[in-house]
A protein has these predicted regions:
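Short helix-loop "hinge" at the ATP-lid/N-box region of the Bergerat-fold HATPase_c
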Residues: 38-39
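Short beta-strand/loop element within the Bergerat-fold HATPase_c
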Residues: 45-58
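Conserved glycine-rich
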Residues: 44, 112-113
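Conserved catalytic submotifs in the C-terminal HATPase_c
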Residues: 9-19, 53-55
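Short conserved segment of the HATPase_c
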Residues: 71-83
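Short alpha-helical Gxxx[C/S/T] motif in the catalytic ATP-binding
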Residues: 100, 104
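Acidic ATP/Mg2+-coordinating residue in the GHKL
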Residues: 66
């Protein structure tokens, strides 16, 4: 499954001066797993947006969203749990391992950040998270 195949547009609004201190592999896994999750579960003909919308002296604050179907409110508290699947009928072949968002959360926490998820009022799912700035 790919961006082109599903007619997905990505808007990257991360500024060129954003520098994050941390483990490259874990930082990559945050964005990769969020993108994979949107591709696999948000549906077709959607937009994915990535934005560092705010910063303070220690952290950058990011919004990662899609304009897809979102999820039922009852699942929001558990989507970061290991092996949790919104649709229990999914198998590893058809719906992943249930580890992607757990990996995202643990990678964010490893970098002293926080993450939360919410449904967007116009549809889709949004992840708000923080990552520590590179200190010079």
């Amino acid at each position: 499954v790919s961006l082109q195949h599903n007619h997905i547009v990505v808007h990257n609004h991360i500024g060129p001066k954003v520098e994050i201190e941390g483990n490259h592999t874990l930082l990559y896994s945050i964005f990769r797993n969020l993108i994979d999750n949107a591709i696999n579960y948000a549906g077709e003909n959607i937009t994915i947006g990535i934005d560092n919308y705010m910063e303070d002296s220690e952290f950058y604050y990011f919004s990662f969203y899609d304009t897809g179907r979102g999820i039922e409110e009852e699942h929001l508290e558990r989507i970061f749990d290991r092996f949790y699947r919104v649709n229990q009928g999914r198998s590893r072949k058809t719906g992943g391992s249930g580890l992607g968002l757990s990996i995202v959360k643990n990678a964010v926490l490893f970098h002293k950040g926080q993450i939360t998820a919410k449904n967007r009022k116009d549809g889709g799912l949004e992840f708000i998270f923080s990552l520590r700035k590179k200190l010079f």
